[in-house]
């Protein structure tokens, strides 16, 4: 940027079309958050009506994560081939239909399947909306674009909590899911009123369609075996999270099978840059493992261990969700100021100071608990607002939507494991201690993975010929791409 440009307030660097693109994507993400968290709010009611165990009830939250990897791959490829806008609209319709189906579910199995549909739509919305906004905004503002966008999910969760306190006590839990069909109206408006992302238009102007991840996996020479592996992964995940398997060795074996399949898909689709993709999946996996036990089971903790009524639960969740939303925006400013990775690490370190007090204070003072949750979620959960920017920077425009969608949503299986892991630990400890212990310990893993830039570092160790030394979104250097003690010019930026 020139000196004269730097003196202009950041928001004036954006034109009306860019603000309209952001507003549309943000509203879509708000609706996504609204639909997705409904199950967490009514989990105890659903558990009581269907006669479920705590682990079975938690698996309904996990179900949406089980299908996310395929939704991210499929709808991400749609975004790479046909444009970010179409993928975003299709995703909204998909998760809205799944939410409506939850309202009509007669039992556990039907609701589990509906949650699978929601997961596919959510995955597509995440990848398509994130790439759409990031590619529509100027490079020096793309951490803000990412953070501001992801705040919509937390705002949607806050809105859902308030609607829950008004609707469920009067009309029951099913009525809450019927409201979730409304985003379809918004999707139809989006289809006609928003422009395509600038980066995507420039990349594809007058050119032949790109070869997407779907083309590579399901139309290439290994398509038969890849289709079989897709069904195998789906079946393995089903048995792990819905099959009520009691044998830990079998569950571990099925999990290992899924890991091998996902790594195989990453190797095929990313070529020599597969080490980067695999490490990004690990980053996201641990990011979900530290954050989603609280996200998924906080309402249950408030209702069961603290004995809060629905109105008080909604008030506490307001502080939590609003803190995460504010944190996404703060993370955007920090990311553009400090750099994406440094901002992430600093925010997570600060959040660690608050996680133990949140669950040690008990339920006697609602306002103090609410304030602690606000700041803990602002620092710990809110910084995830710049995660799409962090991941997207490792992929070129041609593969960004599918790369971000698949990588993020395979890693998001940590969100499927997290509530079940929290529920299992809570069988030996109280739920609050289980949630605090998981979050506190696993946050340090994420700090190390991001702080040391392990995706670039492992790429340099295993396949240095395909190393990317600079972020593809904002052109800033990757610290892990340069060995310690080397000069800044040790590597040349690659165009993979």
Curated annotation (Swiss-Prot):
PROSITE patterns named among the record's database cross-references: MFS
**Cellular-component GO terms for this entry:** plasma membrane
- The UniProt entry lists the main location of this chain as membrane
As its record notes, the protein acts as a catalyst of: N-acetylneuraminate(in) + H(+)(in) = N-acetylneuraminate(out) + H(+)(out)
Domain of life where this protein originates: Bacteria
The annotated topology with respect to the bilayer is: Multi-pass membrane protein
Q: Which InterPro entries match?
A: MFS (IPR011701), MFS_dom (IPR020846), MFS_trans_sf (IPR036259), SA_transporter (IPR004742)
The GO terms describing molecular function are: carboxylic acid transmembrane transporter activity; sialic acid:proton symporter activity
Subcellular location(s) of the protein: Cell inner membrane
Which keywords does this Swiss-Prot/TrEMBL entry list? Cell inner membrane, Cell membrane, Membrane, Sugar transport, Transmembrane, Transmembrane helix, Transport
Q: Which SUPFAM superfamilies match?
A: MFS general substrate transporter (SSF103473)
**Keyword flag Transport:** yes
Pfam families tied to this protein: MFS_1
* Endpoints of the signal sequence: none
User: Which stretches are transmembrane?
Assistant: 22-42, 58-78, 86-106, 116-136, 148-168, 170-190, 224-244, 247-267, 278-298, 313-333, 353-373, 374-394, 406-426, 431-451
PANTHER family in alphabetical order: CARBOXYLIC ACID TRANSPORTER PROTEIN HOMOLOG, SIALIC ACID TRANSPORTER NANT
What is the role of the protein in this entry? Catalyzes the proton-dependent transport of sialic acid.
The family this protein is said to belong to:
Belongs to the major facilitator superfamily. Sialate:H(+) symporter (SHS) (TC 2.A.1.12) family.
How is this protein named in the record?
Answer: Sialic acid transporter NanT
| Native organism | Salmonella schwarzengrund (strain CVM19633)
Lineage runs: Bacteria, Pseudomonadati, Pseudomonadota, Gammaproteobacteria, Enterobacterales
- Gene of this entry: nanT
């Amino acid at each position: 940027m020139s000196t004269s440009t730097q003196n202009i307030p950041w928001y004036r660097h954006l034109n009306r079309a860019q603000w309209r693109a952001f507003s549309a994507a943000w509203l879509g993400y708000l609706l996504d958050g609204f639909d997705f968290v409904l199950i967490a709010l009514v989990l105890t009611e659903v558990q009581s009506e269907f006669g479920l165990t705590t682990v079975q009830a938690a698996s309904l939250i996990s179900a949406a994560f089980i299908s996310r990897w395929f939704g991210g791959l499929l709808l991400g490829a749609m975004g790479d081939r046909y444009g970010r806008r179409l993928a975003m609209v299709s995703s909204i319709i998909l998760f809205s239909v799944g939410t409506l189906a939850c309202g009509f579910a007669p039992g556990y199995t039907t609701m589990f399947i509906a949650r699978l549909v929601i997961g596919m739509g959510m995955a597509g919305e995440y990848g398509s909306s994130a790439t759409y906004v990031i590619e529509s905004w100027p490079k020096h503002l793309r951490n803000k674009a990412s953070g501001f966008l992801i705040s919509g999910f937390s705002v949607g969760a806050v809105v859902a909590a308030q609607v829950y306190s008004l609707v469920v006590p009067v009309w029951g839990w099913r009525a809450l899911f019927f409201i979730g069909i409304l985003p379809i109206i918004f999707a139809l408006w989006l289809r006609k009123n928003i422009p395509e992302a600038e980066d995507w238009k420039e990349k594809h102007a007058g050119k032949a369609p790109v070869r997407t991840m779907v083309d590579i996996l399901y139309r290439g020479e290994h398509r038969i075996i890849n289709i079989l592996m897709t069904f195998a992964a789906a079946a393995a995940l089903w048995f792990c999270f819905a099959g009520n398997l009691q044998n830990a060795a079998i569950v571990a074996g099925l999990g290992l099978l899924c890991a091998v399949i996902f790594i195989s898909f990453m190797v095929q689709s990313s070529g020599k840059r597969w080490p980067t993709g695999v490490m990004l999946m690990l980053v996201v996996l641990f990011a979900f493992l530290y954050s989603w036990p609280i996200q998924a089971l906080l309402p249950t903790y408030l209702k069961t261990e603290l004995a809060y009524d629905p109105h008080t639960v909604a008030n506490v969740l307001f502080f939590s969700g609003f803190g995460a939303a504010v944190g996404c925006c703060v993370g955007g400013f920090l990311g553009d100021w400090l750099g994406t990775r440094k901002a992430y690490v600093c925010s997570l370190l600060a959040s660690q100071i608050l996680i133990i007090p949140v669950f040690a204070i008990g339920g006697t003072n609602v306002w103090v608990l609410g304030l602690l949750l606000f700041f803990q979620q602002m620092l710990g959960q809110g910084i995830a607002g710049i995660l799409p920017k962090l991941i997207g920077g490792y992929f070129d425009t041609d593969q960004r939507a599918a790369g971000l969608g698949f990588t993020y949503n395979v890693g998001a299986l940590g969100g499927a494991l997290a509530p079940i892991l929290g529920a299992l630990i809570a069988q030996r400890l109280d739920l609050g201690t289980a949630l605090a212990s998981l979050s506190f310990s696993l946050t340090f893993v994420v700090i190390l993975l991001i702080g040391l830039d392990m995706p670039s570092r492992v790429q340099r160790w295993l396949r240095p010929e395909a190393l990317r030394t600079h972020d593809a979104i904002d052109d800033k250097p990757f610290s892990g791409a340069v060995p310690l003690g080397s000069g800044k010019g040790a590597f040349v930026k690659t165009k993979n």
